[in-house]
């Protein structure tokens, strides 16, 4: 096949000459048309070609007609307008080269009958399974003043306890809490952190497929934000119950779920039947007459009774399934082909079963131990085989044949099981019965009998003649059947060789003739690549009436070897170019050119009409009935035998091979996509913790030798520590809570500085009032058991804040407030005019100390009396000595307090 530019060399699956073509093959051909020139032909039937610059007189004022080529409906079914050009097919086929024909042996016996061929069932056992689990979603967040930050989450799947599974299967509900015991500690998680254990209804999930139904309690996970400047971790709980399909493959020692979960337990294990069990037995439970809901999402609570229900507990899921009897739900063999007419030939060591419709011979070794099939081996398909044999017999053989014995079961060398039901013609069956009865009557009695009549003797001779006739007929029939079978086998072998060689010349025509439909074929090495042709829109095919090609300036460039056609694909209005091929095939492209001949005459067939071209220009239409046919068919006087078409044997179809694997990729990807859609993705940034400066310093130090490397490590360690410390500070400050603490600390420091500054300023301005507040107050003293109230007024018109008078001097304006003038205290007795000595100073300090102790006691007493008042609290006033020793932290005394000396 000639390759065409633009064809994508990709193999497209699921396309064969017998099956349905997928859209992928259409896409393949659309890729071919991408390089085709898209034109819009004129809608008129006749087009006048102008002369232009061409000097050929034959082109002047020539009327060229574009022909609408229609195909008759009878021919359209076999050879419609189609495209068969492709670089690579989708199926690979080859001719059988190892056909073995056993020569006829007159001593072998051949018989005809009905043959059923059973193959091993590779499809897995499919059953309903349930999974029970809870999804715990823990979400950590931080609440700021105006924003709520989601910091992360963790998802965990846990198995439901068995007591809660009973609630799910009976009520369609599950609880909003989950308890886990780790060591001696018990942990309980609640849905939405509400600290209440309630029940939630199951409902159908939106995501699912035909084989998997998922029931959940929560469609969207909720999250409760925390308080301002605090972290909070919330829990959202979702019960997930899945009704899906489990698959187990022969020998049924494990099964697989669509989610990829593998359980190493036979689905038929019931606890005592000896089936495979490779899991923890304490986690396995089985119940009889178990009640389970048909639909967990329905409030109708319609249940069904399961004879045996098994559950297996795992850490993250509980798996349940119905336990059935293996002999009732599975069969190791499955019917492959039914051969209505077959021939079995018996040889010395084997039986050969010839299936004419399959063009195959199946061999059974007589002495192979594998041929001994037990009743248990055929139990699962014995009844079906008997019904099928009776159906074929009543349809095709009831009037002319009888069954020869019962059906027998045989195993071929390829592992197939053949059910053989021998047939015998009714006339031969009657002769055989008569011969057997004659033999029985001849040997049935040894007693002496009365001489028979002459006609009885004649009857004995006729029985012998019948027996001889039967034996002779059987021999001739067996010989005829043997020769026919051998000749038929040799003919098929030679035909296969001839077709194999012819396919190297034109594989498309040979394969089209074999399969009876137009196909595109190409020899690829020692095999043939096969694909089906694509039909175009039959009503849009238009043949160009001119096979000459001119340049833009009107010069003749050459001539097309095949007529140019316009066409459109189905369900498309885009017009494309091609060339007309044999049997209505459209060849893609217009590159098939040749040198123009002067006296050219050609006829091209499209449909049931011939189109005549002279000098590469269409002249007229020709009826094909006017052209004689070369008849190569030699008609037989007898009825011809049925034609035998080659058939590609497929022991297992593509669907069976796809379903044979327990790991269904499509189901696994659906389950994966379901889980993926439910995930919340968090983007993380990866930051290099090493600063670029330290990294450059380390590289520089490494170049200075061992000493530099050591210094670099020390500097790097110190720099790393400093960087970590600074990073910690930056992290603390950038944290909202840390920033608030720093702000409060700064405000406190500023307040403390202002307070200290004001105290120091007041002490500097009035130090005597600050350190000795008692001096500016009214003094009450007791001297010599006499109470004298002394006031120290200042000059007239001034306040009484003046200091006491010096000894020996009468203060101006002072007067005795408690006694008469005669009894006034004389200042001379106190040593008027003399300075205070050290002893006087000591007595004054002692007096101040006694005054300080007295005031302190009064303050303590006053504090105890006012402790009952909750609205005010008076702090203990420090004494004078304390003020002198610790001048900081003084508090100003009240003006109404008295000082007693």
From Swiss-Prot:
Region Involved in fusion and/or binding to host membrane, residue ranges: 141-147, 226-233
PTM (free text): A proteolytic cleavage by host furin generates two subunits that remain linked by disulfide bonds.
Keywords, sorted A to Z: Disulfide bond, Glycoprotein, Host cell membrane, Host endosome, Host Golgi apparatus, Host membrane, Host-virus interaction, Membrane, Signal, Transmembrane, Transmembrane helix, Viral attachment to host cell, Viral envelope protein, Virion, Virus entry into host cell
Superkingdom of this protein's organism: Viruses
Region of interest (Hydrophobic membrane proximal region), ranges: 683-734, 714-734
Signal peptide residue numbers: 1-34
Site annotation Cleavage: residues: 451-452
Intravirion membrane side: 758-901
Cell compartment(s), UniProt: Virion membrane; Host cell membrane; Host endosome membrane; Host Golgi apparatus membrane
Keyword ATP-binding belongs to the record: no
Its membrane topology: Single-pass type I membrane protein
Annotated glycan sites: 53, 60, 66, 197, 270, 289, 328, 372, 398, 406, 436, 537, 571, 623
GO biological process, one term: virion attachment to host cell
CC per GO annotation: host cell endosome membrane; host cell Golgi membrane; host cell plasma membrane; membrane; viral envelope; virion membrane
Renumbered residue ranges of the record's region Disordered: 794-813, 852-901
Transmembrane portions of the chain: 737-757
Protein function: Envelope glycoprotein that forms spikes at the surface of virion envelope. Essential for the initial attachment to heparan sulfate moieties of the host cell surface proteoglycans. Involved in fusion of viral and cellular membranes leading to virus entry into the host cell. Following initial binding to its host receptors, membrane fusion is mediated by the fusion machinery composed at least of gB and the heterodimer gH/gL. May be involved in the fusion between the virion envelope and the outer nuclear membrane during virion egress.
HAMAP family from the UniProt entry: HSV_GB
Protein's recorded name: Envelope glycoprotein B
Organism annotation: Guinea pig cytomegalovirus (strain 22122)
Taxonomic classification: Viruses, Duplodnaviria, Heunggongvirae, Peploviricota, Herviviricetes
């Amino acid at each position: 096949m000639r390759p065409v530019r633009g064809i994508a060399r990709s193999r497209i699956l699921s396309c064969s000459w017998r099956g349905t073509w997928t859209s992928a093959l259409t896409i393949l051909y659309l890729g071919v048309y991408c390089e085709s020139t898209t034109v819009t032909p004129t809608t008129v039937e006749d087009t006048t070609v102008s002369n232009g610059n061409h000097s050929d007189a034959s082109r002047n004022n020539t009327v060229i007609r574009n022909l609408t080529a229609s195909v008759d409906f009878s021919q359209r079914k076999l050879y419609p307008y189609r495209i068969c050009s492709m670089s690579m097919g989708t199926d690979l086929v080859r001719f059988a080269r190892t056909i073995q024909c056993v020569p006829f042996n007159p001593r072998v016996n051949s018989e005809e009958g009905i043959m059923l061929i059973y193959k091993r069932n590779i499809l897995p056992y499919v059953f309903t399974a349930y999974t029970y689990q809870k999804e715990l979603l823990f979400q950590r967040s931080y609440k700021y003043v105006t924003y709520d930050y989601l910091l992360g989450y963790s998802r965990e799947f846990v198995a439901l306890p068995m007591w809660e599974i009973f609630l799910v299967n009976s009520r369609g509900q599950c609880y909003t809490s989950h308890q886990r015991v780790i060591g001696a500690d018990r942990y309980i998680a609640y849905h939405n952190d509400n600290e209440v254990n309630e029940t939630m209804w199951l409902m159908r999930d939106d995501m699912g497929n035909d084989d998997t139904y998922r029931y959940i309690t929560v469609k969207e996970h909720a999250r409760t934000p925390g308080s301002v400047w605090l972290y909070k971790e919330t829990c959202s709980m979702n019960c997930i119950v899945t009704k899906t399909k489990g698959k187990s493959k022969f020998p049924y020692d494990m099964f697989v779920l669509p989610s990829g979960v593998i359980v190493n337990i036979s689905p038929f294990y019931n606890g005592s039947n000896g089936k495979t069990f490779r899991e923890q037995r304490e986690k396995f439970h089985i119940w009889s007459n178990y009640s389970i809901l048909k639909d967990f999402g329905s409030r109708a609570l319609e249940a069904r009774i399961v004879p045996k229900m098994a559950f297996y507990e795992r850490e993250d899921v509980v798996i349940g399934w119905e336990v059935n009897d293996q002999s009732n739900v599975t069969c190791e063999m499955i019917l492959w082909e039914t051969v209505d007419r077959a021939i079995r030939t018996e040889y010395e060591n084997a039986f050969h079963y010839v299936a004419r419709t399959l063009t195959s011979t199946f061999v059974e070794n007589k002495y192979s131990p594998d041929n001994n099939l037990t009743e248990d081996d055929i139990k699962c398909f014995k009844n079906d085989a008997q019904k099928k044999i009776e159906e074929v017999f009543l349809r095709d053989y009831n009037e002319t044949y009888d069954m020869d014995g019962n059906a027998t079961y045989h195993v071929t060398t390829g592992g197939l099981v053949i059910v053989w039901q021998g047939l015998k013609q009714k006339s031969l069956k009657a002769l055989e019965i008569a011969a057997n009865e004659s033999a029985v009557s001849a040997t049935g009695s040894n007693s002496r009998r009365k001489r028979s009549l002459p006609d009885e003797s004649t009857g004995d001779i006729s029985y012998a003649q019948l027996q001889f006739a039967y034996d002779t007929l059987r021999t001739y029939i067996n010989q005829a059947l043997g020769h026919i079978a051998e000749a038929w086998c040799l003919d098929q072998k030679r035909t296969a060789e001839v077709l194999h060689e012819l396919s190297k010349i034109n594989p498309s025509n040979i394969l089209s003739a074999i399969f009876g439909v137009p196909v595109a074929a190409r020899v690829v090495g020692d095999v043939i690549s096969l694909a089906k042709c694509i039909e175009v829109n039959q009503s849009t095919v238009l043949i160009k009436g001119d096979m000459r090609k001119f340049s833009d300036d009107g010069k003749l460039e050459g001539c097309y070897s095949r007529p140019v056609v316009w066409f459109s694909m189905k369900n498309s209005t885009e017009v494309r170019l091609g060339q007309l091929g044999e049997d209505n095939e459209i060849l893609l492209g217009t590159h098939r050119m040749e040198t123009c001949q002067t006296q050219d005459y050609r006829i091209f067939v499209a449909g049931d009409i011939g189109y005549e071209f002279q000098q590469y220009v269409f002249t007229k239409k020709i009826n094909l009935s006017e052209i004689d046919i070369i008849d190569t068919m030699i008609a037989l006087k007898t009825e011809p035998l049925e034609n035998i078409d080659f058939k590609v044997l497929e022991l297992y179809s593509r669907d069976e091979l796809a379903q044979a694997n327990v790991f269904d990729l499509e189901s696994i990807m659906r389950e994966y996509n379901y889980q993926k859609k439910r995930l919340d993705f968090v983007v993380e940034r990866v930051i290099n913790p090493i600063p670029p400066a330290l990294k450059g310093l380390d590289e520089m130090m490494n170049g200075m030798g061992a000493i530099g490397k050591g210094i670099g490590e020390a500097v790097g360690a110190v720099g790393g520590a400093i960087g970590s410390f600074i990073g910690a500070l930056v992290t603390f400050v950038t944290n909202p809570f840390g920033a608030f603490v720093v702000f409060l600390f700064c405000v406190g420091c500023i307040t403390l500085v202002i307070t200290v500054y004001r105290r120091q300023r007041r002490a500097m301005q009035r130090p005597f009032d600050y350190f000795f507040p008692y001096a500016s107050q009214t003094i009450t003293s007791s001297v010599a058991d006499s109470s004298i109230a002394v006031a120290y007024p200042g000059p007239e018109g001034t306040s009484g804040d003046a200091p006491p008078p010096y000894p020996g001097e009468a203060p101006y304006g002072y007067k005795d407030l408690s006694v008469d003038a005669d009894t006034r205290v004389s200042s001379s007795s106190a040593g008027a005019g003399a300075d205070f000595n050290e002893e006087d100073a000591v007595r004054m300090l002692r007096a101040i100390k006694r005054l300080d102790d007295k005031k302190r006691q009064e303050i303590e007493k006053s504090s105890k009396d006012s402790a009952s008042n909750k609205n005010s609290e008076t702090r203990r006033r420090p004494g004078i000595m304390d003020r002198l020793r610790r001048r900081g932290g003084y508090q100003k005394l009240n003006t109404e307090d008295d000082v007693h000396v």
